[in-house]
Amino acid sequence: MDYTNNQLHIIYGDATLGVNGKDFQYIFSYERGGLESLKVHGKEWLYRVPTPTFWRATTDNDRGSGFNLKAAQWLGADMFTKCTDIHLKVDRHDFAELPIAPFNNKFSNHEYAKSAEISFTYQTLTTPATNAKIIYNIDDVGHIKVTMRYYGKKGLPPLPVIGIRLIMPTAATGFDYEGLSGETYPDRMAGAKEGKFHIDGLPVTEYLVPQENGMHMQTKKLTINRETTQNNVDRTNEKFSLSIQQAEKPFNFSCLPYTAEELENATHIEELPLVRRTVLVIAGAVRGVGGIDSWGTDVESAYHINPELDHEFSFILN
């Protein structure tokens, strides 16, 4: 089909919503609770559904100060998500209920729109529980504005990070970003310089005991480059890219070959698994790394994330 009028082709599946246009196809799964497929120019960018992330691999300072024990609930909340609500809006039509089978039979294969918005609400597996929401807003050229809202609640333990984790099917060959030089954290930004930077591969800082690393604060734009897919008949090995841009404010990110849990599970650098995928975390709030004296003193309070306050951030996929 030739998409010449900048309209979205909306496909109301039995348990999914398809949003197609020129050179892009997106599938949102009601069953899995999120964006299941993100294809751009025929290349798949998702290995699994993006989810809220609340855990980062603990640092020497975290372990020395006991932060890992205080925040342990967030590890479970990071590993397991519970989607409790899905809301859909196409153009100005606000769906009172999801258009799943058999309700979707009223729609044809020729449904078009200028915009679509779908939100997924998740309940954290913590005590007390709270909610986080991821909202996808797609415009007529296929740009996706992604917004995450974390709803603060009294009585929750301190947070390591608030973000969205996107796991990609294969390892990136590198990434380019516009922001601050080097690895930066809220309490480690003073020496950084603004500019445009290129990183080869997916480097991991070789600590004796693997830990949190690779965060980049206050980023305006990020482009991730890959050359391989999981499609056995796709043997082009030509570079293809996905870009993430700031929305209202700069974002923070890490782009590593491991999840926080994989880093957490290894007691030595050589115990990390073979590099297979790309783990992108876009973070709205990041806890500082501390290290004031002998890696035992807590992070200064200015660099904590208050779990009782609401947090919101956005970025644009294109």
From Swiss-Prot:
Keyword line: Glycosidase, Hydrolase
GO biological process, one term: lactose catabolic process
GO cellular component terms attached to this protein's record: beta-galactosidase complex
Record's keyword annotation contains Glycoprotein: no
Gene3D superfamilies: 2.70.98.10
Pfam families to which the protein is assigned, alphabetical: Bgal_small_N
Keyword Nucleus: no
GO molecular function list: beta-galactosidase activity; carbohydrate binding
EC number: 3.2.1.23
Induction: By lactose. Part of an operon consisting of lacL, lacM, and galE.
SUPFAM superfamilies hit by this protein: Galactose mutarotase-like
Catalytic function, reaction form: Hydrolysis of terminal non-reducing beta-D-galactose residues in beta-D-galactosides
Role description: Component of a beta-galactosidase.
Family stated for the protein in its record: Belongs to the bacterial beta-galactosidase small subunit family.
Oligomer and partners: Heterodimer of a large (LacL) and a small subunit (LacM).
Name of the molecule in the record: Beta-galactosidase small subunit
Organism from which the protein derives: Lactobacillus helveticus (Lactobacillus suntoryeus)
Gene assigned in the entry: lacM
